[in-house]
Regions:
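Helix-to-loop junction immediately C-terminal to a conserved catalytic motif
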Residues: 6
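Conserved ABC ATPase "signature" region
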Residues: 21-22, 63, 70-88, 140
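Short coil-to-helix segment of the ABC ATPase nucleotide-binding domain corresponding to the Q-loop/switch region
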Residues: 52-59
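Conserved ABC ATPase signature
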Residues: 92-96, 100-102
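A short, proline-enriched helix->beta-strand linker immediately N-terminal to the Walker B motif
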Residues: 111-115
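ABC ATPase "signature
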Residues: 177-178
């Protein structure tokens, strides 16, 4: 689903509306701008660059945008503090726990200050205690940052815990949409 929203996979039909604009109508340049400036992605498998430090991983979206090294490292340091990884900026992914790696992935998605976050099962690879802790941190952070988030999960309890509106899908089709209470 998230790969369809940002058109990494081309949908066969329908519309994808972001800010009342149909992403299906975007040309290549407009689509690239959407991906680089408006959408941040958090992946299930962390997708960190092993040859880059934590700070460089976080700063990567800003590097792609052409932001100066000093400005992107300043921004990355601020986000590092927000995700509670102060002091870990010079470490590499293999030196971090799974929960810490996922925090780096979230920090990288937030570094470019996107309007939208696409999160593809971001906590599913983590043990239950770390998963619960990161869910709590995400809830707190989402209240602070005020980002529209599409959070994909196969865990209904997680959806109810972190979601404001939930869409339940079966066989690729939405079968129900509502609030957690509904």
């Amino acid at each position: 689903l998230v790969r369809h929203i940002n058109r990494l996979l081309e949908p066969t039909s329908g519309k994808i509306l972001i800010n009342d604009q149909d992403v299906m109508q975007f040309n290549k340049d407009h689509l690239q701008e959407l991906r680089n400036k408006k959408i941040g992605m958090v992946f299930q498998n962390f997708a960190l660059m092993p040859h880059r430090s934590v700070l460089d991983n976080i700063a990567m979206p800003l590097e792609i945008r052409g932001v100066s090294k000093n400005d992107r490292l300043d921004a990355a340091n601020k986000i590092l503090n927000i995700v509670e990884l102060q002091g870990w900026g010079n470490k590499y992914a293999h030196e971090l726990s799974g929960g810490m790696q996922q925090r780096v992935g979230l920090a990288r998605a937030l570094a470019a200050d996107p309007e939208f976050l696409l999160m593809d099962e971001p906590f599913s690879a983590l043990d239950p205690l770390i998963r619960r802790q990161l869910q709590s941190e995400f809830i707190k952070l989402s209240k602070q940052m005020k980002k529209t988030t599409v959070f994909i999960t196969h865990d209904l309890d997680e959806a109810v815990r972190v979601g404001h509106r939930i869409a339940i899908m079966r066989d690729g089709a939405v079968v129900q949409i509502g609030t957690p209470e509904e």
